[in-house]
Amino acid sequence: MASSPGSTPLAALLLLALFSASAASRFAPVDNHLIACGATGPAVLPDGRRFIPDTGCASMRLRSESSTLPTAAPNAPAAPSPLHAAARVFSCHASYDLAIRRRGHHVLRLHFYPFDATLASARFHVGAGGFLLLHNFTASSPVVKEFLLPVDTDVLALTFVPEAGSAAFVNAIELFSAPEELVGDIGTLVDGDDIIQTDGLSSQVFETLYRINVAGHKVTPFNDTLWRTWVNDEGFLVNKESSGSKAWSFGGRIAYPKGSKLMTREVAPDNVYNSARSVNSEGNLTWAFPVPAGNMYLVRMHFCDIVSKALYQLYFNIYVNGRQAVKDFDISGTTGYLAYPYYIDFVVDLEDEGLLEVAIGGSNMSRAGEVSGFLNAVEIMRMNQTGGGMDGDFPAILDMDYLFSKGIGEFARSLLCGLLFAGLFLVLVTLVVRLRTELKNNGTLWSRQSMDSGDGKLARAYQLVPTKTDY
């Protein structure tokens, strides 16, 4: 069928309007540093973001005690991402100073792709804003480390500290302003048998360990407004064949509340809420995640009722590490809508355990044989320790806010200058004392010997030293 005259321009206008609306709704951070470290030219990703080289950028400067080396990856095999084609290698302390236009929480991602043996064996520390992020870190395989940290200065110093005899490196840096709704201040503390409300979460630093899309496909940065990656839950599901377990997929529209500052697509994208796993009143589902022991964790569980046909039909229990964190959870009473996203933040202290488990199970209020509970997604983040470190403490001389705010190179230079000044002052005092002693002793000896001896050598040797006989 032939198209009518003018349909092509009309279609083009409609597409342009749709594209403009989509672009306008996409998250645009105030601070947005995208840096290709060691690169000679820009690196453009499939999601459209453009990373610029770490030299010649007005909003960023690189400081180091000695020259840093831009290193290019070998031609074969080809790097899986344009960000992995080069790296910046540090043989000593170095800092990136990143300008901050809006203070508050920022997302920081550090890309490590060790394309040679030197990088794979490098061992170093990384600090930012007075916090130790990585301690004795080695990237023997490709990895992206993501952090969510509060920034209260106009310049954020991102510092790399190689271990003695080793090097430090980084392939790419992302630092951008986080939306306010991404970080809440209140959570539920699961501490033994006590389930209590806790606050102060907004002042913490978080390291993302897991971001799971339950029963859904992998979500890439191309489909996430904050350029996150969500992986499928299959590898973490303990009892997939639990009674009444079912995977769900939703083709409708997720009902984000208009004008809400709490729930937006920046908290989690549609692709995360469009899938879920459910259990019936007799069953339960458990997910297990290996984590380092001796840390506190934020567990964020996402819920969006895409399984019910009507409101007020679901009641279920939520468990964290075997403890009942929420009893008879009523998602309809909480949100008042179907397909309406919601999340709960739990705080867990793992002193000796190296495994973190979350689970959903049927409630006594559930209808027998009917769908009872569900889960759409889960995020697990490690929280910073009281000493400001994510993974242990820095050596005492390095664990200083001044060091991170001013830069390690400047601190070391200041310390060296102070030591040199003190040494010179001590030498000067010693010389003055010795000179005064010699003036006194040698002056008396010269006067006596010049009268008793006819040898003039002693007088010539000390002829610039006056004595009483010279007046």
Outline where the language-model segments fall.
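Compositionally biased, intrinsically disordered or flexible polar/acidic segments
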Residues: 2-471
